[in-house]
């Protein structure tokens, strides 16, 4: 088995929830798990949206300055080959830089890329960074970002990837981040979940 297959097996064998929600809006509150499966884990892409042409697209910020949908067709040619730069110049909505000794890594909040730097090479793009808890970032989103990156590196295939943060009312911090991805053309790796 390839590395990406091992990652996928590890993620879904230890799936935190056997329950699958029909949509992200059904997931009303944190249930003690870093992510839950949506729509039977079927990716939310139409046939017309599927492409192997690499691109990335970031929606404009809303009237509160909050990120909206970010989408990409991830391939080797989009992925960076240098380390991520400094992103401290971006202050996403709800940002608070507070350190706690009892929080792993020290920070309760992280600047979270909607489309991970390792997938897109996007650094300090304000349309791609939200305020999220370190837990959501490292336990919820990162395993899937690593899976997609590993898959692309090992197979040289492309992956459709879409992330849309959910903001309740006027809240400046996202209450969840639905992530949908699928490999082209055979859908060997795919997911539809909310972190």
Walk through the language-model features, giving the residues of each:
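A motif-centric signal for short, conserved binding hotspots located
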Residues: 155-181
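Betabetaalpha-Me/HNH-type nuclease active-site subdomain
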Residues: 50-125
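Sequence context surrounding c-type heme c attachment/ligation sites in exported
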Residues: 141
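Conserved small/polar residues in nucleotide/adenosyl-binding loops
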Residues: 182-189
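Hydrophobic alpha-helical segments, chiefly the membrane-spanning helices
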Residues: 193-195
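N-terminal, intrinsically disordered, polar/charged segments of Gram-positive cell-envelope systems
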Residues: 2-45
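Short beta-strand-alpha-helix junction that forms the catalytic/metal-binding core
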Residues: 119-138
